[in-house]
């Protein structure tokens, strides 16, 4: 009965976290609008080999992540949940793999369910797993790779070992087709500490070639197909997207070595109090035959690799969370049989986070905030109340697990529930009107649908326009952003209109129909005075629509 109740509670939490709130949240630019539009264009064109974005070649990532994202729009249409379905699906499958591995490493199914609970309700896992990016899909393949390696190493027969290594290669091959060569490096460095400690070199060298071969076999058809269709793909993808991003001084998203430490600590909420003990247990496991040290290497080695890399984004460390969830579940299992100090500390952390969030909203971000730079407007008192309630829920469950830790520590999983359910409604208007272009697009849909040409100076906004209007011919105004490479091809001529060319371009092209220019204004809200006067203007925060009617 307890087993059924545990699964039922987990299912209810999953629905409340990953299903209920997602349709109502507007898409964020640039990430969600980008991946929504790439999949829409892939489905519309039927070309599942060469990724295109706004009708241009887009070689920042391989293709398998888009295939998974395509499923959402293919099954559920063009809603916001459909766009996020790929991330949710990948997160669920990763959680099932966490259960599978935890069931083998921990004693009994209950700790394995706890591992899934910790994984699905960790802040970073939830935030990224309900957000339309490729990292949850990549994490799925990396989790599958690490589970496959463990399966192979624990097999007692040569056939079983071979099967595990073949699955390892297939997972790495799919990871490679999702985010590139990183998928081949992460499993290698992740297993290295355990292989050294357990002296598993023989099986690694005997069966490792099977993994290499299966990775090649699953990825080779697309590798050859993309090379045939686009001969420059591999040069650009390898040099620009790997060497420059991870190693060179001009890498994108540069950040210091310690960048990921606070991301990890915040991302592990509401389970942060369990981290020190879990890491300690993992280190102690280096001298045993158990899996604790394997999990520790899986968590730490990729974390160090990402920290060394020049380019950094918070989502990159998502593959580290599956092993940490299992380590923490094992640590909790030992705690409940000994003393619950770490559980009380975890409850205290959550109580303080909840109270701190409430204080930040009421004293800093509210219209009456003490800093004089509020995030909420005077007309958004309702949103202030909702935000306060969201963090109040966090504090409530934190207090419950603090004062009744042995009985109610699992309710830490509900700490994020208020944020998950209310964030879409409680988001400040100035955030919505700079990061969620649907706020403007849906208000101006008749004007945009009537436009012969549409331009934007923001790639993320342009992607939102293309996805909402179901047209890929959105032109860039003055800026290229991440479309610089695609715009460099001769057949992309005309997709970029520079600011100094715009008056003449406008005079010529408005003869064919109305023209809409959608701008993402700078933070100071200044509008370029050199822009031609528009026939219609609509502004929502930093989003500005200028429409020019057709003229003979």
From Swiss-Prot:
Q: What biological process terms from GO does the record include?
A: lipid A biosynthetic process; lipopolysaccharide biosynthetic process; protein O-linked glycosylation; response to iron(III) ion
GO molecular function terms attached to this record: 4-amino-4-deoxy-L-arabinose transferase activity; mannosyltransferase activity
- One Pfam match, given by its short name, reads PMT
**TM stretches of this protein:** 4-24, 81-101, 113-133, 176-196, 207-227, 255-275, 289-309, 313-333, 351-371, 384-404, 411-431
Q: Give its localization.
A: Cell inner membrane
Which topology term describes how it sits in the membrane? Multi-pass membrane protein
Q: Which PANTHER family match?
A: MANNOSYLTRANSFERASE YKCB-RELATED, UNDECAPRENYL PHOSPHATE-ALPHA-4-AMINO-4-DEOXY-L-ARABINOSE ARABINOSYL TRANSFERASE
Q: Which family, according to UniProt?
A: Belongs to the glycosyltransferase 83 family.
From the Swiss-Prot or TrEMBL record, give the protein name: Undecaprenyl phosphate-alpha-4-amino-4-deoxy-L-arabinose arabinosyl transferase
Report which gene this protein is encoded by.
Answer: arnT
């Amino acid at each position: 009965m307890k087993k059924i109740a545990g699964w039922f509670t987990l299912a209810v939490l999953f629905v409340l976290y990953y299903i209920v709130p997602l349709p109502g949240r507007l898409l964020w630019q640039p990430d969600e609008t980008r991946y929504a539009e790439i999949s829409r264009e892939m489905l519309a064109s039927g070309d599942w080999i060469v990724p295109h974005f706004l009708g241009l070649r887009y070689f920042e990532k391989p293709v398998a992540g888009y295939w998974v994202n395509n499923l959402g729009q293919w099954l559920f249409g063009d809603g916001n949940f459909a766009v996020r379905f790929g991330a949710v699906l990948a997160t669920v499958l990763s959680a099932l793999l966490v259960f599978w591995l935890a069931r083998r490493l921990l004693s009994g199914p209950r700790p394995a369910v706890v591992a899934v609970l910790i994984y699905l309700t960790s802040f970073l896992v939830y935030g990224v797993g309900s957000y339309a990016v490729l990292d949850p899909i990549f994490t799925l393949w990396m989790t599958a790779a690490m589970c496959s390696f463990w399966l192979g190493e624990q097999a007692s027969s040569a056939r079983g070992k071979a099967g595990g290594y073949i699955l390892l290669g297939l997972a790495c091959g799919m990871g490679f087709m999702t985010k590139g060569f990183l998928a081949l490096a992460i499993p290698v460095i992740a297993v290295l500490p355990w292989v050294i400690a357990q002296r598993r070199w023989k099986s690694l060298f005997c069966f490792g070639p099977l993994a290499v071969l299966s990775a090649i076999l699953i990825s080779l058809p697309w590798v050859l197909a993309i090379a045939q269709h686009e001969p420059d793909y591999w040069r650009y993808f390898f040099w620009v997207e790997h060497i420059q991003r991870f190693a060179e001084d001009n890498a994108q998203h540069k950040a210091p070595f310690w960048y990921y430490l606070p991301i990890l600590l915040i991302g592990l909420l509401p389970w942060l109090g369990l981290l020190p003990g879990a890491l300690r247990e993992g280190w102690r496991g280096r001298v045993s035959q158990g899996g604790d040290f394997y999990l520790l290497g899986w968590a730490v080695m990729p974390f160090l690799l990402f920290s060394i890399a020049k380019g950094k984004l918070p989502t990159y460390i998502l593959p580290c969370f599956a092993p940490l969830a299992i380590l923490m579940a094992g640590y909790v299992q030992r705690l409940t049989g000994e003393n619950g100090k770490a559980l009380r500390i975890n409850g205290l952390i959550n109580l303080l986070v909840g109270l701190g969030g409430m204080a930040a909203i009421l004293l800093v971000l509210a219209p009456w905030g003490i800093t004089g730079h509020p995030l909420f407007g005077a007309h958004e008192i309702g949103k202030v109340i909702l935000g306060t309630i969201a963090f109040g829920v966090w504090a409530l469950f934190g207090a419950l697990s603090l004062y009744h830790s042995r009985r109610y520590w699992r309710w830490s999983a509900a700490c994020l529930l208020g944020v998950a359910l209310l964030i879409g409604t409680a988001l400040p208007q100035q955030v919505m009107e700079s990061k969620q272009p649907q706020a403007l697009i849906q208000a101006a849909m008749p004007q945009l649908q009537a436009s012969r040409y549409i331009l934007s100076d923001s790639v993320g906004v342009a992607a939102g326009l293309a996805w909402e209007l179901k047209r890929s011919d959105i032109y860039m105004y003055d800026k290229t952003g991440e479309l610089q490479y695609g715009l460099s091809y001769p057949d992309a001529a005309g997709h970029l209109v520079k600011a100094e060319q715009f008056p003449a371009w406008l005079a010529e092209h408005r003869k064919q129909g109305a023209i809409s220019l959608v701008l993402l204004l700078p933070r100071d809200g200044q509008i370029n005075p050199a822009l031609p006067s528009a026939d219609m203007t609509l502004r929502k925060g930093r989003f500005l629509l200028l429409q020019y009617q057709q003229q003979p």
